[in-house]
């Protein structure tokens, strides 16, 4: 306990001086770019595992809890985790980033500034998501409600994708984000190489049009807009990876039945020219609750392998597994089962990367810091606990880093 208190105290001191450290100790790494199915950083292929920490800006809004961000990032680098995925939104509600359309809470924005500055100082790349599909933290529902309050004829959350005013709200948020000047680093977000890329939305879905055409049209419009205001950063969709009408065989053999009404199409959504890399998530426990553990593990491997095959041969773009995990509330759960999921996931990613394939890394859901009980859930992991799962994370991330060190470019023809 004394050791932990010392670490937390040290983290607080670092956090209090971060406005200087974030600038003076900034990593010299450049922007992550793409060449064929690989990411490139400083002229070499870039492979890296990472984690989700959606709570960064929320906790960093209060300067007295910013040490949690520092502590998590320090622990992440110890375990060779060098990408973090986080929310670039909190629409309405407590500690909102966007209080109303185009109206932002400066204190909350400074929380996101701090998280980016700390990631920069400690050499961690960031993937930042613009909005949520779900009503958690506002999301599509909040945007539609804002439009409804102005007298717009909207009745469904899916109007988010078609209503002109709602679409303009989204574009305004994107523009505000990319033009934000970080109060710690003094660098505009669009010029910040610490940001690896943006995601259009967290797990976009459109039940109003199961064909996928509405969502694809929205993604095309918004992806082109993002690129028009920020040409330096990579962009992806934030999709779960469910197949649509463009891949009928994959749709039948891989999708959970419930996913076939969500209006997403892994191939069509990612073939868009302005989308730089593919995004998938993996939760076989949630998607196939009636299957036994062995069957779910086999489906996990097949899910990853098929998406990697399509990223290589059809999309010709890199792929990041943006979310995965093993919930502790799965009936019959054991630590060994969680370890098996992490091993299978990381092994599949590594096998692709070692061959110069499209797998760039896996980001598990999700990391919390010691004592963060308000964010604890069946999927949360505390790195400092050094569980068997954490040991697997460390070993596999170091292996992936060694591929990066070899600097071999793919010979794949594009």
Curated annotation (Swiss-Prot):
Gene3D superfamilies: Glycosidases. It is an enzyme of class 3 (hydrolase). It catalyses: Random hydrolysis of (1->4)-beta-D-mannosidic linkages in mannans, galactomannans and glucomannans. Glycans are attached at residues 17, 75, 133, 153, 343, 386. InterPro entries: Glyco_hydro_5, Glycoside_hydrolase_SF, MAN-like. GO terms for cellular component: apoplast. The active site is at residues 203, 323. Keywords: Glycoprotein, Glycosidase, Hydrolase, Secreted, Signal. It comes from the Eukaryota. SUPFAM superfamilies: (Trans)glycosidases (SSF51445). It is found in: Secreted. Substrate binds at residues 87, 202, 283, 365. Belongs to the glycosyl hydrolase 5 (cellulase A) family. This is Mannan endo-1,4-beta-mannosidase 3. The lineage of its organism: Eukaryota, Viridiplantae, Streptophyta, Embryophyta, Tracheophyta.
